[in-house]
UniProtKB/Swiss-Prot annotation:
Naturally occurring in which organism (per UniProt): Pyrococcus furiosus (strain ATCC 43587 / DSM 3638 / JCM 8422 / Vc1)
Matches recorded under InterPro entries: Ribosomal_eL31, Ribosomal_eL31_CS, Ribosomal_eL31_dom_sf
Record-level GO cellular component terms: cytosolic large ribosomal subunit
A Pfam entry, by short name: Ribosomal_L31e
Keyword Lyase tagged: no
Listed name of the protein: Large ribosomal subunit protein eL31
Keywords: Ribonucleoprotein, Ribosomal protein
């Protein structure tokens, strides 16, 4: 079930899923991309805007050791653009 526009939902993003796939020196940048993909998939959003605090939390312990899981609050809004239909935008902040 998709999140309705205007709703806020808390997700726990399992960042540890990428640890075996990605080399140590790429973990934090890949973790940011994983958060973006995870939220886009679960919120059914075309655009995901991540708060700088979420980025700082991922990078807090350096490039090699991102947190194994991260609780984030996601707010979904719909916006009309010229020449297009409505676009779903997900805003991600720390929970």
């Amino acid at each position: 079930m998709a999140i309705k526009a205007g709703e806020e939902v808390i997700f726990t993003v399992p960042i540890k899923k990428i640890k075996k796939i990605v080399p140590r020196w790429k973990r934090a940048p890949r973790a940011v991309k994983f958060v973006r993909e995870f939220v886009a998939r679960h919120a059914k959003a075309q655009e995901v805007i991540i708060d700088p605090k979420v980025n700082e939390k991922i990078w807090e312990r350096g490039i090699e050791k991102p947190p194994s899981k991260l609780r984030v609050k996601v707010k979904v809004e719909e916006e009309k653009r010229e020449g297009e239909e409505t676009v779903r935008i997900a805003y991600v902040t720390l929970a």
